[in-house]
């Protein structure tokens, strides 16, 4: 597959979600990705069986890779991996902390032997901290970072974000860091050692509630489908469905009142004449606006919102997403048939990438063992 990273070779000692997210983006960009799997396979292969008997996770984040089974307890297989790494540009791994070092594949040893190699270690908790050795999974990180605490409604208690955001975001952070390391290597000729943790990734995303608590002295509230710092920016109910409406400036607030609600006086109400006041008086604001919307249809209001150029979004089901006007899908070949997946976001020179094939377990064992034979 051609692309910006054509000619780049990646060895991925990976499992589950975070590292495969990083390497599938590298594969989409044209890199050759060799996925090393335990003899029984990456356990994400058995998360579910929704796609022709195959896992949704595995189909999504393992396209364009070569699958090679290795048993790292066997010296011959460990030597095979070492020979692959001798020719690799990038090594991505998310085994348990310390596992690669015990195998002789730690970053210090590898970069001593291969100075141009970029090593990316993905862990649950931050390297060098007391929690680094702990096991960590997506939901645990959502809980530990406070993300679960700020997610949900006032009466719901802490909630999980609806997707595996810790894993997915960490994979993207690793992908970005690897690309930066490739650019640096082009200038210096030297590889890099990258350490990325799920905790650091989500903690970085938590900076707004963190700064609110640290410097504003306020523990952020769970607001459900509402923005904690902007109002009105939340869900309103109509006769035939729900819509999130977003007002981003004082000018838009006046336009909403005058052109959508036909109520210029509301725009001058001293309780609501600045964003700070509107967020402070959010309950009264939402009650006032909801009273204006009661009995009206979504089409009636969205026509006014479109004309006034006020942003909104309908509350969609996943079924709605399947038929959404903005949704793009691409075909992916799997061992059990062609699946349609939602497309990666980048459109380059008017084109979406061509996605590679999802490998069967050990599909490339023979060819890779021959290619990297001693």
Report the location of each language-model feature:
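Glycine-rich beta-alpha junction loops
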Residues: 40, 124-126, 198-203, 240-242, ...
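N-terminal helix-loop segment corresponding to the beta1-alpha1 unit
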Residues: 1-187, 334, 360, 364-374
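Terminal low-complexity tails and localization/encapsulation signals of metabolic enzymes
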Residues: 1-9, 221, 237-238, 316-374
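Flexible glycine/proline-enriched surface loops and loop-helix/loop-strand junctions
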Residues: 156-165, 237-241, 350-352
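Short, well-structured beta-strand/strand-turn elements
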Residues: 33, 306-321
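Conserved Rossmann-fold dehydrogenase catalytic segment
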Residues: 127, 155-163, 186-202, 221-228, ...
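Oxidoreductase and adenylate-handling cofactor-binding alpha/beta cores
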Residues: 171-191, 204-214, 258-262, 267
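Aromatic-enriched alpha-helical interface/lid elements that frame and gate functional surfaces
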Residues: 231-308, 312
């Amino acid at each position: 597959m051609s692309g910006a990273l054509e000619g780049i070779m990646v060895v991925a000692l990976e499992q589950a979600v975070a590292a495969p997210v990083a390497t599938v983006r590298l594969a989409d960009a044209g890199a050759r990705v060799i996925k090393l799997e335990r003899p029984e396979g990456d356990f994400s292969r058995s998360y579910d069986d929704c796609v022709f008997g195959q896992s949704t996770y595995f189909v999504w984040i393992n396209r364009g890779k070569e699958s090679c089974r290795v048993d790292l307890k066997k010296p011959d297989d460990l030597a095979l991996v070492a020979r692959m790494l001798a020719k690799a540009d990038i090594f991505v791994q998310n085994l348990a902390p310390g596992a690669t070092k015990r195998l002789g594949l730690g970053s210090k040893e590898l970069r001593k032997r291969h100075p141009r190699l970029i090593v990316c270690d993905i862990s649950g908790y931050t390297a060098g901290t007391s929690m680094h050795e702990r096991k960590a999974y997506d939901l645990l990180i959502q809980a530990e970072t406070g993300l679960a605490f700020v997610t949900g409604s006032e009466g719901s208690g802490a909630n999980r974000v609806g997707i595996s955001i810790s894993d997915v975001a960490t994979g993207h952070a690793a992908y970005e860091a690897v690309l930066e390391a490739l650019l640096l290597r082009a200038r210096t000729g030297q590889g890099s050692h990258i350490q990325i943790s799920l905790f650091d990734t989500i903690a970085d995303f938590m900076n707004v509630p963190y700064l609110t608590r640290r410097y504003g002295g306020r523990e952020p509230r769970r607001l459900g489908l509402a923005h904690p710092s902007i109002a009105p920016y939340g869900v309103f109910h109509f006769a035939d469905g729900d819509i999130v409406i977003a007002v981003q400036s004082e000018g838009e607030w006046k336009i909403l009142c005058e052109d959508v609600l036909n109520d210029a006086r509301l725009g001058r109400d001293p309780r609501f004449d600045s964003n700070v006041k509107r967020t402070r008086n959010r309950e009264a604001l939402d009650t006032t606006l909801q009273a204006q919307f009661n009995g009206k249809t979504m089409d009636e209001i969205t026509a006014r919102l479109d004309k006034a150029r006020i942003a909104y979004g309908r509350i969609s089901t996943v079924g709605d997403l399947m038929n959404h006007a903005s949704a793009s899908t691409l075909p992916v070949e799997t061992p059990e048939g062609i699946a349609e997946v939602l497309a990666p976001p980048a459109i380059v020179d008017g084109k979406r990438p061509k996605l590679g094939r999802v490998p069967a377990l050990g599909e490339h064992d023979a060819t890779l063992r021959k290619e990297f034979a001693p």
